[in-house]
């Protein structure tokens, strides 16, 4: 990936001869891979750095996302995508990274992901990548980013401060809806991407000699959360960043303790103390209190009062009279970034109940296995250590957790221009759609629990989920467990997501013919029906 980025000449630099092109784009590794704590299926997070050459929204669009579509490994002008299948006019004026990736034979599942930090998602050479984009003054690039491994927290803080000086303070006061509507996320996303790298570097500095203990504890807790279906920030659950903060806090406070003790203390703290706290300053979980750039941090850093206000406005607009359950739920787990950010922002009243229930169950199970763990510590039962850990990590099958399930089915033809993007967009809307359309309109439903792992991921549609005429389409399926009485859901969920997707295109034309090539459907199952489907689909 680094070589691919290095050999790419962005649109904003196309007026330079290739031989004299010196402002080479850079790939900056972030996330769990930089921490050395990646698991087998961890995404590789990267920040693409490009020398600034113009107005930031224009450069973002031209250099990063581009304006063309990726169809059959060709980057094509939207206006030149004809209705007749197979008649595609190739145009070569888009020099964006999106198009550079589109035409690479090792790239699969390429998509633009609009959000607080806009990213390009893809699979490259078998690995999943999430790429964000930052433009910096050429002087800063040359000064601090010649050697990635030599980058320090202080250097990155200086870069972020200079970047921040060019931004109006009001940008940091905007709520998420305003940020997306005014496209401020293209600029704010850049500073948050740099802040994410800063957090990773700071974790390494703080943990120092305890970094290996942290890595083991982090991977263990992450696997536990995944196996218990509460790992996935976009669905309102824990994510890699929140687990990193929680684990690093307990490694730093128990640096001389064993891995088992550290994890036990973390779960004990959450269940016996933190879950019972009122929402005030005492509940905020941090691993450092930064002292530098105090005046700037007063403007840009996360703030409890501001988030409470934003959550109240957000959920009041979304849910009307039943908003308090979610607006008053807050998990303030703060990354050591610049600006600081709350990793638990997406957690709501429903996912809060689910996470707490699973963590309490994990703590109870830990206590049952405590004697076996004590023997591990004394090296008396080493031969059984693998099985003891498996017993604790095992979260069972999702299809056993609830009596009723809802399948959210996004399907498209193989030739659909926008189908893959629509399904990607659908995934980002599931969390809030379940609150506003399913739970809010059905008081007998206590909560909905979406399994963060797709049931089907870009697979041929099976007859168990679609009508016969769609069996040659591609399916993405999410399964939602329902706690409470089930009432049939009408087409509102599908219609709302379609409407929001069309708004997101911001006036860019959607061919009528392509609108018929992707769909969103829902289907109910009881537990036994879902288990029978599993037996058919996964019998091999």
Predicted regions and their residues:
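Non-catalytic helical "accessory" subdomain of NTase-fold nucleotidyltransferases
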Residues: 1-540
């Amino acid at each position: 990936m680094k070589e691919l980025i290095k050999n790419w000449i962005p649109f904003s630099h196309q007026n330079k001869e290739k031989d004299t092109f010196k402002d080479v784009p850079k790939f900056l590794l972030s996330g769990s891979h930089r921490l050395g704590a990646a698991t087998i299926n961890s995404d590789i997070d990267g920040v693409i750095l490009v020398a600034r050459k113009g107005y930031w929204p224009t450069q973002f669009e031209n250099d990063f996302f581009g304006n063309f579509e990726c169809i059959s490994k060709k980057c094509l002008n939207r206006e030149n995508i004809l209705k007749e299948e197979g008649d595609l006019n190739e145009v070569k004026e888009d020099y964006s990274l999106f198009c550079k990736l589109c035409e690479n034979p090792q790239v699969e599942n390429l998509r633009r992901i609009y959000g607080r930090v806009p990213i390009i998602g893809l699979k490259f050479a078998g690995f999943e990548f999430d790429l964000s984009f930052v433009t910096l003054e050429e002087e800063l690039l040359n000064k601090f980013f010649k050697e990635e491994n030599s980058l320090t927290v202080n250097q990155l803080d200086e870069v972020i401060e200079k970047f921040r000086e060019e931004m109006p303070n009001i940008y940091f006061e905007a709520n998420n809806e305003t940020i997306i509507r005014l496209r401020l996320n293209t600029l704010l996303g850049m500073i948050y991407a740099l802040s994410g790298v800063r957090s990773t570097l700071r974790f390494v500095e703080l943990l120092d000699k305890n970094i290996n203990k942290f890595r083991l504890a982090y991977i263990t807790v992450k696997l536990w959360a995944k196996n218990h279906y509460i790992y996935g920030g976009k669905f309102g659950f824990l994510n890699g960043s929140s687990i990193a903060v929680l684990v690093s806090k307990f490694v730093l406070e128990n640096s001389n303790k064993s891995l088992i003790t550290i994890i036990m203390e973390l779960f004990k703290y959450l269940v016996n103390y933190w879950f019972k706290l009122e929402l005030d300053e005492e509940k905020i979980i941090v691993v450092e209190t930064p002292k530098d750039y105090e005046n700037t941090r007063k403007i840009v850093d996360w703030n409890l009062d501001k988030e409470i206000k934003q959550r109240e406005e957000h959920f009041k607009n979304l849910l009307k009279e039943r908003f308090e359950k979610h607006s008053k739920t807050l998990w303030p787990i703060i990354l050591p970034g610049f600006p600081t950010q709350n990793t638990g922002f997406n957690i709501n009243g429903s996912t809060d109940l689910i996470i707490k229930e699973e963590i309490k169950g994990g703590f109870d199970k830990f206590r049952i296995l405590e004697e076996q763990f004590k023997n591990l510590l004394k090296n008396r039962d080493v031969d059984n250590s693998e099985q003891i850990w498996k017993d604790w990590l095992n979260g069972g099958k999702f299809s056993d957790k609830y009596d009723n399930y809802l399948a959210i089915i996004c399907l498209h033809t193989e030739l659909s221009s926008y189908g893959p993007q629509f399904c990607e967009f659908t995934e980002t809307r599931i969390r809030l759609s379940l609150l506003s359309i399913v739970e809010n309109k059905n008081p007998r439903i206590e909560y909905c629990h979406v399994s963060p792992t797709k049931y089907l991921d870009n697979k041929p549609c099976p007859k168990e989920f679609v009508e016969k005429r769609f069996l040659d389409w591609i399916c993405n399926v999410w399964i939602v467990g329902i706690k409470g009485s089930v009432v049939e859901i009408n087409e509102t969920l599908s219609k709302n997501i379609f409407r929001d997707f069309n708004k997101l295109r911001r006036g860019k034309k959607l061919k009528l013919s392509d609108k018929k090539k992707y769909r969103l459907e829902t289907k109910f199952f009881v537990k036994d029906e879902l288990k029978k489907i599993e037996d058919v689909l996964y019998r091999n």
